Amino acid sequence: MGAVVLGKIHLRWCDECDLPILEQATCGICGGKTRQMKLTPPGDARPAFKSNIERIKSLVDSQFGEGCGAAIVPEGHIVLLNKAPDIDRMDEVIVDGTIVGAVRYELLAGEKFLLRPSGATAIAPLVRKSWVTIDPGAAKAVLERSASTLAVGILDCDGGIVPGDEVLVLDENRNPVSVGTSKMSASEMKGHKRGTAIKTRWTVIAEPRGSGKEADWKDVVKANNEVLTRRVDESKRFIHKVVSENDLPVAVSYSGGKDSLATLLLVLDAGIRPKLLFVDTGLEFEETKRNVAEVAREHTLELIVESAGDSFWRNLQHFGPPAKDFRWCCKTCKLGPATQLIQKHFPKGVLSFIGQRAYESQQRAEKSRVWRNPWTPNQLAASPIQKWTALHVWLYLMSKGARTNPLYEQGLERIGCFMCPATDLAELRRVKEISREYDRWQRFIEEHASEKGKPRAWLDYDLWRWKRLPKSVVDELGLGHEACLSMSAEQTDDAPLRFESTSGYNPCVEGLSMEGVFSKPLPMERVANMLGIIGSVTTSPDGNIAEVKSITVFRDGPVMIRAKDEEELRRKAAMLREIVFRAVECAGCGICTGRCPNGALHLDGLVTIDTAKCDHCGRCLGPCPAVRFKQDDLDI
């Protein structure tokens, strides 16, 4: 996967104090020079909590033998995690100013620890599993040319190695040479004299490393005091400026997460007493709701709550499971209640400070620091922490002694809806372990899979999180064409065709969109053909998806529409509905054929379009017996 650059990588390291330093070329404790850390972008490193560290140690021990985990992550050392782009999830593990390895979640195999050179050096004297020793000639080839390890050069190996294992390669004196992935089993390595046994990922060379001094997070805060003071002062100036320029009541949108907590504390530091706004989506963790109430009490702030109630569960019957590419839930559970809250309590407008950060996503990186949501025009939003990294946020919270949501210390990176489709599988597995709320969702998704004839993989890998499976996921799971087709298995339904939709600004992906659903599966060949009325149509290889002019239609009924403004969104929705009704309920009357100036419409029982003749003028749209609705019937 390509690098995701969302801003400058601010992480540096003081080797003398063995502490992470943000931005500064000198350490805030010893005054010594710091060095730039080379992280995978976006470089939004965060603290590893006790539960994270214990899971890392356990994983390393299970792969390489007892005691290796403690060697990788020594007691009393600062540990950071840096999320890197991957098919599902990968976190680089930073200890003593070096990346010792990465925890990667593989869809089929689960969590694996991928050693890096410094991690290999740390465990080499202790390794009892997943090791091979090679002869001097092989070691020279690996070190000098980064060559893979061939079977002919292997002297000995752990008898439990199977293809796909992460392996530490040692020389005859058991010094680390390289790390990589096994391509053979142990018996094949010993029995074969040709072929690649270990595909090299990294050769082991000396890397800069901290002194190994023990430290705690109070030391890190102290070492970064100057940069924290500078960041806080800038944010306070920004807050004062926005407040002075807008004669509006001030609020903080609070979610129970670290970023909104930091934003609240900055507003309080600026001497402003805001109202606290919380939208209860109906999908919140109990820990989050408790945190919201506790924070309001601790700071004696007026808490205004708007709840979506059971909106999510009611709308499931119409829209089916939400997905990364079909986020109807953002409209019904976030945007709707937020709009109601503002209209009810701030009819003349409100200035709302929001914990948005550029390092969270490309969309947020491109967003202004002050903005208006087109669907909540009474809300002026502003972010004091737009250019902060996660580590800036955490160090600020630590400096304030803030009580954060306990879910972070239980291993979650993000706090939101407990079954958010944007969640990666690794984190979703953790949610299932700790969340009582997830049981209801699991029951629904199992019943839905049974009713719709979904294959077992749809449940096992939570593939409900997509309407259109990414090629990387299809390839990783080894899903063939037939399996992909059955992910959206068509069901027969003789009931009348209906269309329901929810539209608005999508707070999850920052875009103007509508998610809708037709009440039964669609004949995609006819729908794709008729969509040619408005433009050139592209279809997926399996024929399950058709796209034209930012309109996406799925065989099993869902649709997604994107537009630059509300007027365009409504126009596209009305046009799509008319076209789909024509495709599904065509009576074969031929009325529309006479409207086409190019003779592109043909009647052979049902109307079809000759795409070679159609110039997408849309003149054929008009009175039609199949379209039994008016423009204002659209449920938007």
Language-model-detected regions and their locations in the chain:
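ATP/NTP-dependent adenylation/nucleotidyl-transfer catalytic domains that generate, transfer
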Residues: 2-91, 96-99, 103-107, 403-575
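Nucleotide-activated chemistry modules centered on ATP-dependent adenylation/adenylyltransferase
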Residues: 2-32, 36, 139-142, 156-157, ...
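Short cysteine-rich clusters marking metal-coordination/redox-active sites
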Residues: 14-17, 27-30, 586, 593-596, ...
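Short linker/helix segments within small regulatory modules
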Residues: 19-25, 409-412, 602-617
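Iron-sulfur cluster-binding cysteine motifs and their immediate structural context
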Residues: 32, 591-607, 619-635
